[in-house]
């Protein structure tokens, strides 16, 4: 600080300036804090179709109420989109992570169930061993989907059956409807088939 008068006036002037500077800094910190604490901008999310319809889409209006300055773009796809190429900020996936360079966090387990309609099993018989599936009508996702790997435990040893159905669909709900209508055997997440098992529509 410049000091052209007596020492007492110089100190008083210096203190006043210091207080103003500190006040300006406090205001700046408060402004930055308010921006930081209020998320804003564009959020691009991708998630599988069936999970999105049941567990994400119904809650988006609540999210918008909580964060009105966040613009949400939801890409619903059963394909594993490349996050970098598609400029995706957040991906929710029901599968094992294949790219270890991505930052991931497990949200929950996803138990799956192999199911068929009672009428189909009455007609074709119930498979006892994974090898029996080769003799059955399989409803699967399209080729290359990670959901086509059906995992079993046989004599305490893991066994994988790669599903390749004569009926291949790219949508979980479409597979579910085909299975309910006696189309064959499928494997879907329990959150998809649970209520149908409970009602006896699937077994």
Could you say what each language-model-derived stretch is?
Residues 1-8:
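Single conserved hydrophobic/aromatic residue that forms the stacking wall/gate
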Residues 5, 23, 38, 86-88, ...:
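Structured loop/turn residues at beta-strand edges in well-structured enzyme cores
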Residues 11-34:
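Alpha-helical "hinge/linker" immediately C-terminal to small N-terminal DNA-binding modules
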Residues 38-41, 47-49, 54-59, 111, ...:
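All-alpha effector-binding/dimerization core of bacterial HTH-type transcriptional repressors
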Residues 40-103:
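Central regulatory/effector-binding core of bacterial HTH transcription factors
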Residues 75-169:
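Acidic, Gly/Pro-rich loop/turn segments at junctions of secondary structure
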Residues 160-203:
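Hydrophobic hinge/microswitch elements
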């Amino acid at each position: 600080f410049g000091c052209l008068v007596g020492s007492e006036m110089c100190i008083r002037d210096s203190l006043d300036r210091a207080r103003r500077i500190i006040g300006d800094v406090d205001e700046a910190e408060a402004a930055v804090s308010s921006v930081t604490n209020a998320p804003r901008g564009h959020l691009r999310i991708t998630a599988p179709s069936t999970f999105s319809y049941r567990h994400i889409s119904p809650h988006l209006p609540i999210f918008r109420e909580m964060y009105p300055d966040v613009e949400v773009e939801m890409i619903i796809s059963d394909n594993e989109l490349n996050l970098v190429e598609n400029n995706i900020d957040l991906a929710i996936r029901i599968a094992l992570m294949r790219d270890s360079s991505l930052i991931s966090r497990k949200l929950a387990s996803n138990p799956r169930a192999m199911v068929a309609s009672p009428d189909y099993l009455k007609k074709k018989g119930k498979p006892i061993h994974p090898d029996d599936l080769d003799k059955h009508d399989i409803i699967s996702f399209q080729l290359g989907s990670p959901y086509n790997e059906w995992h079993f435990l046989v004599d305490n040893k893991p066994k994988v059956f790669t599903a390749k159905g004569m009926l291949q669909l790219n949508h979980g709900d479409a597979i579910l409807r085909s299975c309910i209508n006696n189309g064959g055997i499928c494997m879907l997440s329990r959150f998809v088939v649970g209520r149908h098992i409970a009602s006896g529509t699937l077994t």
